[in-house]
Amino acid sequence: MATSATLTTTHLSTFRNILDEWHQNRSKTTPTKGFLVPFEELQQSSKKDALKDVIVAFRTRPPPNEAAEKFHGDPDAQDAAETEAASAAVEFCSGITVTSAEPGVFFAHVPGMKWSGPTLTHKPYEADLAFGPDVGNEEVYQRTVVASDILSLALSGGVGCILAYGQTGSGKTYTMESVEHRVARDLFDQARMVGKRLVLAQGGAQASDTEAGDIFEFNVTFLELLGKHATDLLESTEEVDAQGNPVRTAIAVREDKVGNVRPNLISSLIRTSEELEELINKALSHRRTSATLRNATSSRSHALLTISIKNKLLPYADEGQLILVDLAGSERHEDSKDHDKQCMEEARDNNKSLMNLKECVRAKAKMAAEDGFVHIPWRSNKLTMLLKPIFDIESRQPSRAMIIAHVSPHIQDSVHS
């Protein structure tokens, strides 16, 4: 039987001893595997991923200094001895072990309780990549976004999507903001490279950097989806709610007469990396946050940055899209039991939309691996409707989704992981 976070904290020293023994036994038989190409050699390497339609990477962050403080005893606990023991156990204990970086494998160490005492179940999970707590943002970006050629795909008229998924407090926003700023840094350089190749392919002379960069037109929108309500993060407003968050006009999310899902958002024409950086910073400053049990500044919403790319050299070509999504955190009942009514409803809607998203991702991966028709239920939720470009099986545009799944490092969260 799985244990609660409070009960896990009470027996933390026992779990730590079990975990140490597991690590010792495993190290004797199975060494930890790293990445196939060292980070220092990554940019010079010709190795590319198989470029599947759906690529999944795990990431776990290092624990913050206050790691254990979040799991001190429950003040409402009836057993005073249990609370006292929990409060004394302030040392961090990891619930995640990455055993292979590429292909990615990690073990979740799930606490349990039997008549004989505390137990740990070591459950393995596999993905394309796995990033441990010692891997920095630049390496994550290079091994995910760059290695999967997502920028080139979008510049070539396809759809590239990067999603940060995970439990509240697991580090999604930290990762996605770093990805957004690195995309802003690299996108225009990549556009000039692709533009030069296009000019040569059309029989033209070697184009200058300016001429190659002018081939593409970039328009940017930034949408926030909070529960069932969508708003425009680029809308300026001075009105705030009781929590100090800005109040914005509700945006409708629906298909138009020809089947496109294009909310009526402010679209900004961007010409340089600096302009894109400024826009990202402006939008992120408008995003709604609130304090939760797990995070003092938790992002309670899904945030979708969409960069539409028009090729002026080939005006009849499909418009490419780059969609960067920082998803709201998934929450267990234990994490949300202290929320007010509004936050409870938001958490419920967020969990439902994340479940719908998982169904769509699984169906898309299954469609790529098997022959025959596979239904992708993207109309089931506003979030998946906004991601129609990567889920619509009738679309002629190539698409690729990179999912960075964040796993909390705390053993108290292993059940959720």
Where are these predicted regions, by residue range?
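Long, basic/Gly/Ser/Thr-rich N-terminal segments
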Residues: 1-114
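P-loop NTPase motor catalytic core
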Residues: 2-36, 102-104, 108-400, 414-417
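Acidic glycine-/aspartate-rich tracts in secreted/extracellular proteins
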Residues: 63, 408-411
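Extended, charged alpha-helical "arm/stalk" segments used for dimerization and assembly
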Residues: 399-408
